[in-house]
Design a protein with these regions (language model features):
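Short hydrophobic-aromatic micro-motifs
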Residues: 13, 72, 155-156
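N-terminal, positively charged, Ser/Thr/Ala/Gly-biased leader segments
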Residues: 1-29, 170-193
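A generic structural signal for short, non-catalytic loop/turn and secondary-structure boundary residues
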Residues: 4-7, 35, 132, 149-151
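Acidic, glycine-rich flexible loop/linker segments
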Residues: 115-193
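Feature captures the catalytic cores and cofactor-binding loops of soluble hydro-lyases/lyases
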Residues: 25, 32-134, 141
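Short, Lys/Arg-enriched charge-dense amphipathic segments
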Residues: 5, 49, 79-83, 147-149, ...
Length: 193
């Protein structure tokens, strides 16, 4: 799935620091390698009790994927074990991007490779968004800018290769396969006699 060059959405706030990958998708749901269908397990332990009954008081029960495609969370988002299932679950649940002041390195890498945009900004931006749930934002991949309505514009780190892959819905392997002919031609031309 490709990420559009610009996403305009309202935010969904989770004012929690250190949300780890086991909270995003618990280990018992990691038995598949299919990306689709994992949204129902996203934040499962927060949304459902030990009997599988919905926790009606949990704010995630009110999440609206049609208008809230951007998750805002506390710092150190995605810490814990490395699992590609975490960005898969977030994407399948309906999020296109996550805004935080800090991401675990492996989670950030897995997200970029799987089409989920991690938007890392300064604490005061996250604090504003957490204090103003359901706030309109615009994320522009081309300029690596987050626009927070009524608050300002803020740059975020995004390398050009990741931006290229995100906007085309490809990963690193897809990129290599797409350019296989050019790579082979280069290798043939650079061989020493």
């Amino acid at each position: 799935m490709s990420f559009p060059g610009v996403v305009e959405s309202r935010t969904f706030s989770l004012p929690v620091n250190n949300i780890d990958t086991d909270q995003i998708i618990p280990g018992q749901f990691l038995t598949t390698t299919q990306r689709e269908g994992l949204g129902k397990f996203c934040f499962y332990s927060w949304r459902f009790d030990e009997n599988g009954d919905a926790r009606p008081d949990n704010p995630l029960q009110a999440f609206d994927a049609s208008s809230q495609q951007v998750l805002v969370a506390g710092s150190n988002f995605g810490c814990g074990s490395s699992r590609e299932h975490a960005p898969w679950a977030l994407l399948d649940f309906g999020f296109r991007a996550v805004i935080s002041s800090q991401f675990a390195d492996i989670f950030r890498s897995n997200s970029l490779k799987n089409g989920l945009l991690p938007v890392m900004v300064e604490d005061h931006v996250v604090e504003f968004l957490l204090a103003h749930p359901n706030h309109p934002v615009k994320i522009d991949i081309g300029s690596s800018m987050l626009t927070v309505e009524g608050f300002g514009e803020f740059g975020f780190p995004l390398d050009s290769f990741s931006a290229y892959c995100l906007t085309r819905g490809i990963d690193q392997l897809d990129f290599l396969l797409k350019n296989e002919t050019a790579i082979n031609r280069y290798e043939q031309g650079s061989k020493t006699p």
